[in-house]
Amino acid sequence: MRILFMGTPDIAAECLKALYAAGHEICGVYTRRDKPVGRKQVLTAPPVKEVALEHGTPVFQPRTLRDGSEDANIQALAPELIVVVAYGCILPRSVLEAPKYGCINLHVSLLPKYRGSAPVQWAVLNGDAETGVSIMQMDEGLDTGDVLVCEKMAIDSEETSGELFDRVTAAGARVLCETIPQIAAGTLKPQPQDHANATLAPMLDKELAEFRLTDSAAHIHNWVRGMNPWPMAWFVTGGRKVKVTECRAVASNGEAPGTVLATKPLTVACADGAIQLLHVVPEGKKPMDGTSFAAGLRLKAGDTL
């Protein structure tokens, strides 16, 4: 099929690779503009742009599509279908209605749950047992279109957002490629979303990543998994931030939150249960295991962290 692809980050790049491998004709690629990255602010192309250029596909990087400035170009490209994966720009009706088969979007949640920019992370943060991928027919709303296909997958209780994202990326690319022939054949039955059951998955930030030892052990465990690899969950002790990259929730005997129960591994009481701080990054220091962190603070059982 003749496809115009729109996407920006790694998950979009993997989907674009899969579309090339499946033999589709990619007539053009829209992505966000190159941006400065890292401490040296090196101007860096989006992953999707790199994949497109490797295949000799024309790349377009407009600031917006909403002003109609790209309508003529999109019409000239004459796509049968527009595929959108984490593009980052809103598509106006003129674009949505341009292709024969309209526009479809890959969303990495079981819609209508977790509409928005961070569905994988919020599934982990909330301790969900399952998530999945959805292919929807796009409309003018935010992840509100009719669902064409969805596929469920289990979330492991120790899985981080990064690990889960790798799995949903692979599943999403596969399901996307399986869906397109069904669109061409007209065999899919779009299912309207139940908007009353919709939930949102807003973007994460560093402040949101904070937890307290007065939280439950289950909450802390989910927060540490869900905020990994970015922005990393953290708490404050002695006036300094400590990031936690790996932990384990365990039982306690009802000790006061913050009480050190053991140092090998470092185990601290919470509001409900206890948490083993397996790997941490103290502010201004290198990553270390929890036992080394406890030794540096000369902690012993019975102390308060």
PLM segments and residue spans:
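Internal alpha/beta domain cores that form substrate/cofactor-binding pockets in large enzymes
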Residues: 2-4, 25-29, 55-77, 82, ...
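An anion-binding loop in the catalytic cleft
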Residues: 213-305
